[in-house]
Every structure is written in structure tokens, then in C-alpha cells.
Regions:
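Pocket-lining segment of extracytoplasmic ligand-binding domains
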Residues: 175-267
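Short, basic, low-complexity termini and linkers enriched in Ser/Thr/Gly/Pro
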Residues: 1-13, 17, 23-27
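Conserved C-terminal helix/tail region of periplasmic/extracytoplasmic solute-binding proteins
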Residues: 302-343
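Extracytoplasmic/secreted envelope proteins and their assembly/folding machinery
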Residues: 50, 81, 96, 150, ...
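Sec/Tat signal peptide C-region and signal peptidase I cleavage site
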Residues: 29-33
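Short, glycine-/small- and polar/acidic-enriched structural segments
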Residues: 34-182, 186-192, 205-209, 214, ...
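Secondary-structure end/capping motifs
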Residues: 232-313
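Ligand-binding clefts/hinges and TM-proximal coupling segments of bilobed small-molecule sensing domains
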Residues: 147-165, 240-273, 318, 327-336
């Protein structure tokens, strides 16, 4: 089964042209108050962690909340950040280290919701490796240095006091999987549904998402980000996007046939067993109240500084609160929205 993530993937120039058109109609819709506010919404990855937005879009939950969301799969968080800073979009679906790097470089893109506030990766290895100590002297593939796959692996190795592992930057999840299949690496850090595909190929899940959670390390694998300047002046739009996302999460967990249909459509999964496992994943791994864990943002920042991927001096003078804003989720909580949604 081919899990290469090419669906909905646009060349950057085409994407920028598309989002400029979306941005140009925001102001009139806000003034008239008659039509849904049209906004570009870049997101990634094309995987199970993005399903709430797909379900919300396909089920008209964004429109119900007064926003006409133009969903554009980009996939690479750094590209999304760069485009947002250029004004091509003001709100997006992503999470993780890219937000930290952006703020420390003077950008104003912050995390405003955490739909998946923990690691959801698995460490897949050759079947001959049966314990964590078997990684010594081996090569493990990740997507990019400083990405979620990298930080998950480093946290795992550090907690198990394993140092002699070669970490190889593969480029993307498809490349990491290919490296494992071809034998160029002994292990790869991947996310569902790729985990399920590798299991069917005979590889071993040495470390599961549950094992990573037991490490007690918070992480924002996915969520919603926004430019602080936009969020401050367009608070109602941000609240509506978060509401639609939460409603998509609820519908996704409650309507198994619909969810499986959309997983099959967008992720090209047709195998009944993989569809079932994918549904179990999305029904169990999303936050009902998508608060951003402050400790997770702090841990990510510290890890990036230790890896020299961000300016450590800048981090020392930057308060942790500069990376996120939980006031939007808190406002929805205080209004009783989440309690009513999940009762």
C-alpha cells in the first residue's frame, strides 16, 4: 500500500496565489456580516492527526460557525510559518517546534490550541530488534532535525540512557519508511497510519505512542496556530475556527462510518483492518478541551536550544507565555461550549 503523501499537495507558488485570493475577501465579509468569513487554512500533515479539520470541512461545520475555510495541505511546518509571516495566511493547522523557532526569531505566530497535546509517534524497527537496548550501534531515520520525530526519538534515547545511535535525517515520513523497507536504516519514527502499514509489512513496533506518554513529556504534535496580531483583532474568527475543529473532533469520534469514509478518501486507506485501527486511533487521541500545555512548550524550547537549533540566549529572555495563548480555549470552556459538546 502506497502511503506517499501527494494528495492535495500543491506547488508553493500555486498555493500562495490561492491563499492571496482567500485573504482578499476577508475584509468585505467581515464588514457585511452576511456571508461566512473566507479564510485560507494551510494544514499538515496529511495524516490522522489532521482528521478533525477534514471532518469539519466535509460536514460543513466551519460554515455552520460562519467561516468559509479554504483548506490547503502544505505539510511542511516551516513553509507554513514562512507563508504566514509573509501575509499569505493568518491561521493554520500545525503544532510543534516550528512555533518556538518562529517566536525566538521575532515572529508573532503562536499556538492557540493543541488538538493532539502529546507524542503520537511510534518507533518501528526491523523484527530482529526486540528491546530498546538493541538500538545501540544502529541507525534510526527521522524526518528532519528538530521535528517531532527527532524530538520523540531523542527523548526516548535520553530516558533510556542510550547514546550510540546514529540519527539520520530522511526528509519526510515516506522517505523514512522507504529507508526502513530498503534496509538503509534499522528503525524509523513514524505516525499513524504509517505505523499500521509497516506492521503489516512485518516490522516491529518497538515503542508505541503509549510508551512515549509514559515518559511524562508533553508535546504539541498538532493544533492550531495564528498570528498574534490577527488573533487579537479578529478574536471572533479564531473562536469560530476552534469551535468548528472541536465539533469536527466530536463528530469524528461519534460517527464511525463517516470517519472511515473520509480516512479512505483522503489517506487512500482501503484495507478494512487498517481503517478500523485508524478509526480507533482518531477516536482516542484528540483532546476534548484543546488547551496548549505550558510545560510542553517549555520542554520543546529547551530541547531545541540544547540542539543549537534556536538561539539559547534569546530563549533565556523570552517568557514561556510568548509561545502560546490559551485565552481562546478558556473562553469557550467558560461559556460551557465543551461541556455541552461532549455531554
Amino acid at each position: 500500500m502506497d502511503f506517499r503523501l501527494s494528495i492535495l499537495d500543491f506547488p508553493l507558488k500555486s498555493w500562495l496565489a490561492r491563499v492571496v485570493l482567500s485573504v482578499s475577501v476577508i475584509a468585505p465579509s467581515l464588514v457585511s456580516g452576511q456571508q461566512p468569513t473566507k479564510i485560507p487554512f494551510p494544514y499538515g500533515p496529511m495524516g490522522l492527526n489532521s482528521m478533525p479539520w477534514i471532518v469539519a470541512k466535509e460536514s460543513n461545520l466551519f460554515a455552520k460557525n460562519g467561516v468559509d475555510v479554504d483548506m490547503i495541505f502544505v505539510g511542511v511546518s516551516t513553509v507554513m510559518i514562512q507563508s504566514m509571516l509573509s501575509g499569505a495566511a493568518n491561521i493554520a493547522g500545525l503544532g510543534g517546534p516550528a512555533v518556538i523557532s518562529n517566536v525566538l526569531k521575532g515572529g508573532d505566530i503562536i499556538q492557540i490550541a493543541a488538538t493532539v497535546p502529546y507524542f503520537t509517534q511510534s518507533l518501528m524497527v526491523r523484527p530482529q530488534i526486540s528491546e530498546i537496548g538493541g538500538l545501540r550501534g544502529k541507525k534510526v531515520g527521522i524526518t528532519r532535525f528538530g521535528a517531532v520525530t527527532d524530538l520523540a526519538l531523542r527523548a526516548l534515547l535520553e530516558r533510556n540512557n542510550i547514546k550510540d545511535v546514529t540519527i539520520l535525517q530522511m526528509g519526510g515520513l515516506a522517505e523514512a519508511m522507504a529507508g526502513l523497507s530498503k534496509g538503509s536504516v534499522d528503525g524509523a519514527v513514524v505516525s499513524p497510519p504509517h505505523t499500521l502499514s509497516l506492521l503489516k509489512q512485518g516490522f516491529r513496533e518497538l515503542v508505541s505512542p503509549g510508551d512515549l506518554r509514559k515518559l511524562g513529556i508533553g508535546f504539541v504534535t498538532n493544533g492550531i496556530v495564528a498570528r498574534r496580531s490577527f488573533a487579537s483583532s479578529n478574536r471572533n474568527i479564531v473562536l469560530r475556527v476552534i469551535k468548528a475543529t472541536a465539533e469536527g473532533t466530536k463528530l469524528m469520534t461519534a460517527n464511525e462510518p463517516l470517519t472511515k469514509k473520509l480516512i479512505s478518501k483522503y489517506l487512500h486507506i482501503d484495507d478494512p483492518e487498517l481503517l478500523h485501527q485508524s478509526y480507533l486511533y482518531v477516536s482516542e487521541n484528540f483532546a476534548r478541551e484543546p488547551f496548549v500545555p505550558p510545560g510542553a512548550m517549555q520542554w520543546m524550547a529547551q530541547q531545541l536550544a540544547q540542539m543549537n537549533l534556536v538561539d539559547a540566549k534569546a530563549l533565556q529572555t523570552t517568557p514561556n507565555s510568548a509561545f502560546f495563548d490559551n485565552s481562546f480555549v478558556e473562553e469557550l470552556k467558560q461559556s460551557g461550549f465543551f461541556e455541552s459538546l461532549w455531554k
